Curated annotation (Swiss-Prot):
Organism, scientific name: Arabidopsis thaliana (Mouse-ear cress)
Record has Flavoprotein as a keyword: no
Residue span of region Disordered: 1-40
A GO BP annotation: positive regulation of protein catabolic process
Subunit structure: Interacts with CDC27B and CYCA2-3.
InterPro entries on file: SAMBA
Keyword Aminoacyl-tRNA synthetase: no
Residues passing through the membrane, by range: none
Tissue specificity comment: Expressed in embryos, germinating seeds, hypocotyls and pollen grains.
Any one GO molecular function term: anaphase-promoting complex binding
Function: Plays an important role in organ size control. Acts as negative regulator of the anaphase-promoting complex/cyclosome (APC/C). Regulates cell proliferation during early development by targeting CYCA2-3 for APC/C-mediated degradation. Required for mitosis I during pollen microspore development.
Annotated knockout phenotype: Growth-related phenotypes, such as formation of large roots, leaves and seeds, enlarged meristem size, and reduced fertility due to defect in male gametogenesis.
PANTHER family: PROTEIN SAMBA (PTHR37387:SF1)
Protein name: Protein SAMBA
Length: 100
């Protein structure tokens, strides 16, 4: 006989002793009250989401700062070959036509 099986639990014994109805089991469970300070599942989920979002934003801020610090490597002249190598497309600046 396993003491952990539902057939041998206190609620099952109470239900059988109370006439086999669910009223005995319900009465046994009604006597147990949860303290009001236990957080609900939704509150725990919301708190976990807030923590995850805060951690994510911290990591994203670090990444943005790193990219901003490295942005000098990407500044400067870029290839403009695509502006001059298509049929008849020339770089136009101030009304004059340039090849570069």
């Amino acid at each position: 006989m396993n003491g952990a099986s539902p057939a041998h639990s206190l609620v099952s014994t109470t239900a059988v002793a109370g006439g086999g109805g669910s009223s005995g089991a319900a009465a046994g469970l009604d006597d147990f009250h949860f303290p009001p300070d236990i957080p609900s599942m939704q509150e725990r989920k919301d708190e976990a989401m807030r923590v995850l979002k805060a951690d994510l934003m911290t990591e994203l801020d670090k990444e943005v700062k790193s990219l901003e610090e490295d942005s000098w490597m990407f500044e400067g002249p870029r290839s403009r070959i695509h502006l001059i190598s298509r049929r008849g497309n020339f770089l136009k600046k101030g009304g004059e036509v340039k090849l570069w």
